[in-house]
Amino acid sequence: MTPTLLSAFWTYTLITAMTPGPNNILALSSATSHGFRQSTRVLAGMSLGFLIVMLLCAGISFSLAVIDPAAVHLLSWAGAAYIVWLAWKIATSPTKEDGLQAKPISFWASFALQFVNVKIILYGVTALSTFVLPQTQALSWVVGVSVLLAMIGTFGNVCWALAGHLFQRLFRQYGRQLNIVLALLLIYCAVRIFY
């Protein structure tokens, strides 16, 4: 990979990993509501699911041109529906002022999010088909970059969770408003799948 292409790869992957999306918003919300330590199950579920999805993207990238457009469209609708459900859960979750301490979303729920998270699927397919496959089709490179993509994504999730933890007091003071804003951002993510 040339230095120019490598620079573009890092720019694309880091910006994509750090911008708002279902994972980052969920990480922020969980750490704000429950603290960083309580959110490690959520982060672990995201990370494992992210890795598996990136490996699946590696396989899909080889044959992307022949994928049935109806299947891709169906995946988009499933992803949007799950993201809207997640937005509803965040918008209606109790805040500290409500006097209730809801449990964070489970490992398996955050794991399952990855398989309908169109942002990370597109992230993986785009990075692999744009930066890796034109340079090499060696399986070791494709798998290695897939693992790297998952690590970069996990880094973004942890950064957002740490922000939620560090600003927890402020976020808890304005918990209801924060939950509404995060839910609206998730709705925006769902709409952006189609437009």
From Swiss-Prot:
It is found in: Cell inner membrane. It is a multi-pass membrane protein. It comes from the Bacteria. The chain crosses the membrane at residues 8-28, 47-67, 70-90, 105-125, 142-162, 177-194. It holds the Pfam family LysE. Residues 1-7, 68-69, 126-141, 195 are periplasmic. It catalyses: O-acetyl-L-serine(in) = O-acetyl-L-serine(out); L-cysteine(in) = L-cysteine(out). Residues 29-46, 91-104, 163-176 are cytoplasmic. The keyword Calcium does not apply. Keywords: Amino-acid transport, Cell inner membrane, Cell membrane, Membrane, Transmembrane, Transmembrane helix, Transport. The keyword Cell inner membrane applies. One of its GO terms (biological process) is cysteine export across plasma membrane. InterPro entries: LeuE-type. GO terms for molecular function: amino acid transmembrane transporter activity. GO terms for cellular component: plasma membrane. Belongs to the Rht family. Exporter of O-acetylserine (OAS) and cysteine. PANTHER family: ARGININE EXPORTER PROTEIN ARGO, ARGININE EXPORTER PROTEIN ARGO-RELATED. This is Cysteine/O-acetylserine efflux protein. It comes from Escherichia coli O139:H28 (strain E24377A / ETEC). The gene is eamB.
